[in-house]
Amino acid sequence: MALHPNFPQSPYAILDPAMRWFPADEALRDTSMDKLMPPLVSQLRNKVKEFRDSGYVGARDTSKSLLNWWFKTPHLLPKIDGTMQEFQYFFSQREALETIVYLYDVVGVQDKYDLMRFDSSGAVSTGMFDETWRRFVVKMATGAGKTKVLSLALAWSFYHKLY
């Protein structure tokens, strides 16, 4: 795998879906990129970028408030020397929460058929989903903060239901 030449060094920088990893072998980039990327990821990342860039159009008020609070409001934490330091979520955490909100509020995902609309590979079939519970698609690497995302998703779910 290779990274885009302009890939940011900061884990907080907002990534354009076109600037993710890509095959180092030039031939694979042209012929097999769609086979290397998990089937739902590519389309969803583009849709979530549009959702983010629009200011979360289509999200419920509670969802917008939480997303703006978590990701656009400065959160200052005291350091041991008494100075303040800004806390930020990793971009991967932000994108994961934005994806969940997008799928729930905007798309209205109810079942596997709703998710299959995002399959850009043609490789996903209903037989791959034996269970009937609602799914949300979040792709995160090891060490990217999945536990924190789960805690934010629980808080979002609680306040979303309450308000």
Show where each model-derived region lies.
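N-terminal accessory nucleic-acid engagement/regulatory domains that precede
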Residues: 1-87
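Generic alpha-helical propensity signal that fires on short helical segments
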Residues: 30, 107, 154-158
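Conserved pre-motif I regulatory segment
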Residues: 55-139
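Walker A/P-loop NTP-binding motif
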Residues: 99-101, 146-163
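The conserved Walker
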Residues: 142-144
